[in-house]
Amino acid sequence: KESSAASDVYKRQGIAAGLATCGKVPFISSFAMFAAGRNFEQVRNSIGYPHLNVKIGATHAGISVGEDGATHQCLEDIALMRTIPGMVVINPADDVEARAAVHAAYDHVGPVYLRFGRLPVPVFNDEATYKFEIGKGIVLKEGKDVTIFATGLCVNETVEAEKMLAKDGIDAEIINIHTIKPIDRELVVKSALKTGKVVTVEEHSVIGGLGSAVCDVLCEEAPTKVLKIGVNAVSY
C-alpha cells in the first residue's frame, strides 16, 4: 500500500537519491541497459557526484540476454560506471558470489553498481567457506605460462577453457576479478610479472571494461602484452 501511494505521488520519479540523504540504504534494480544506459545522467549527477549510498542492481547485462535483442544487450555499462567518481563496480561470477556481493554492497558506504546476467550459471564457490571482499581478486588456479583474468559469467567459461589449455601443455593462472573498480592492482601486477602474458575475458565491450581496467594498471606499473577477449564494438 505504501509503495502504491508513493508511485501515485511520484510518478516515474526516482527517489533513491533522496532516500539516501535521509540515511536509508536504497537498492534499485532494472535491466543494465536502463540502469546504466538510460539512467546514466541521473546516476552521475544524483548519486555519483554527491557520493550517495545507493546500490544499483543491474540485471540482464551482456549478450546473454539473447532473444531480447541488441537494444537490451548492454555491452557498455561497466565502461560507463567506471567513469563515475567513487562508484564501485562488481560483476559476480555465480550465485554464491552474487549473494556475498549484495551483502558487501550494503555494508559499503557509497554508490555500488552490481552487474548480473540473465542466464543461470554453474555454482563453483562453496557458500560455507566463501569470503567476498570488495577490491580483492581471487586466484582460482595458479599457473606460470599465462594469466587469464575473467569476470562475471565468463569466469566459469574460463575455468573450463583452462582444462583445454592444460591438455596442450599450457599452465594458465586463472583469476576471478569480481570487482572491476576498485580493481585489485597488487594482484594484477603480481600475476602479470609472474607469467609475462595476460588475457582478459568478459561479456562486455573490449573498450572500457575489465580489459581496459587491467591495461590501465599494467601500463603504469608493469607493461605486459595483453589480449582482450570480449565484444569488439567497432571494426576500426
Locations of regions flagged by a protein language model:
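Single conserved hydrophobic/aromatic residue that forms the stacking wall/gate
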Residues: 1-6, 10
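Conserved protein kinase catalytic domain
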Residues: 10, 44-47, 215
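Thiamine diphosphate
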Residues: 65-66, 117-236
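Amphipathic, non-transmembrane alpha-helical secondary structure
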Residues: 13-14, 41-44, 99, 103, ...
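Structured loop/turn residues at beta-strand edges in well-structured enzyme cores
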Residues: 4, 52, 85, 193, ...
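Short acidic loop-to-helix transition motifs that present clustered carboxylates
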Residues: 11-13, 36, 95-98, 179-184
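Conserved thiamine diphosphate
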Residues: 18-147, 156, 172
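Short, structured active-site "lid" loops
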Residues: 7, 27, 196-200
